[in-house]
Regions:
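Conserved, mostly hydrophobic/aromatic
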Residues: 20, 50, 79, 120, ...
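Flexible, acidic/Gly-rich N-terminal and inter-domain linker regions that tether
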Residues: 1-77, 81
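Radical SAM enzyme [4Fe-4S]-AdoMet core and its adjacent flexible, acidic
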Residues: 232-239, 243-269
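Short, catalytically relevant binding-site loops at active-site mouths
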Residues: 215-219, 245-248
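Short, well-ordered secondary-structure micro-motifs
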Residues: 131, 162, 185, 221-223, ...
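Structural motif corresponding to alpha-helix initiation and N-cap regions
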Residues: 40, 157-158, 221
């Protein structure tokens, strides 16, 4: 297939997406056959199609979010990419949970700079009850500012999510990271299903979910497509697209950095 023919195919098959429909399975497969090798004119066609879909669905507006590392390091999980894992020797900062006033002060500083969403992020699989209460107090303070109060605190129960929602939580962040099939290559201390259940629990609790993945860990294009479809089925409202920055001391320290074109292909997907 010539680049011109491929670009024409992309424009043709992407039209249903612009109008709000979903692609038929066969059309999706045809695009996924072309995307991994797309360059030049073909990749530009994919990018233009992605922009058209975005404009049709959510327009051109952008929001600015920021986070605070409220608790850092000493994590018991063994995620192969993470400098905060206690399983690996890295130079990641380590500190216990910040007190609520410091978290709120960090949020206020960001609000003055035009940030409209602020996330409280903590290392570890889940927070103990007393720390959860501290975060709830901080979220209440953040919610009083002209910004949305978000959090990323690991695997939480519906009761814990309800407590945070009552305190002012606007949305919850919990990445799936990769496909179900590739996940055991990246993490064995937590099941993929546990992560998926967090997304379900948020939906049952009426909490919008922000969930995406990390790319460049050695996953295949089939893994990337599977993750995208899983996130679609989970009904997430925002999908963070992260690219691996290999960190010395972690199992993925020697992974090559993704090329610019490969990063563009992933964003298009």
């Amino acid at each position: 297939m010539t680049p011109t023919h491929a670009a024409s195919l992309v424009r043709e098959l992407s039209q249903p997406l612009v109008s709000g429909a979903f692609l038929a399975a066969r059309d999706r497969e045809r695009l996924l056959e072309v995307l991994p090798r797309a360059t030049g004119e073909t990749l530009d066609a994919f990018a233009a199609a992605a922009v058209a879909v975005r404009r049709a669905r959510i327009g051109d507006a952008a929001s600015l979010c920021a986070i605070v590392s409220a608790k850092s390091g000493r994590c018991g999980e063994n995620c192969a990419f993470c400098a905060q894992s206690g399983h690996y020797a890295t130079n990641a900062p380590q500190h216990p949970l910040l007190p609520p006033p410091r978290i709120v002060a960090a949020a206020a500083a960001m609000a003055r700079r035009g940030v409209t969403r602020f996330g409280v992020v903590a290392s570890g699989k889940a927070l103990p009850d007393e720390e959860l209460e501290s975060v709830a107090t901080a979220l209440t303070g953040i919610a009083r500012l002209p910004m949305a109060a978000d959090a990323s605190l690991g695997v939480l129960s519906e009761d814990a999510l309800a407590r945070l929602k009552a305190a002012g939580l606007a949305a919850y962040h919990h990445n799936l990271e990769t496909s179900r099939a590739f996940y055991p290559s990246i993490c064995t201390s937590r099941a993929f299903e546990d992560n998926l259940e967090v997304l379900r629990a948020c939906r049952r609790s009426g909490i919008p979910v922000c969930s995406g993945g990390l790319f460049g860990m050695g996953e295949s294009w089939a893994d990337r497509a599977d993750l995208a479809l899983t996130l679609l089925e989970a009904g997430v409202f925002s999908v963070p697209v992260n690219f691996l920055s290999p960190i010395a001391g972690t199992p993925l320290a020697d992974r090559p950095v993704l090329s610019r074109d490969e990063a563009r292909r992933i964003v298009v997907l």
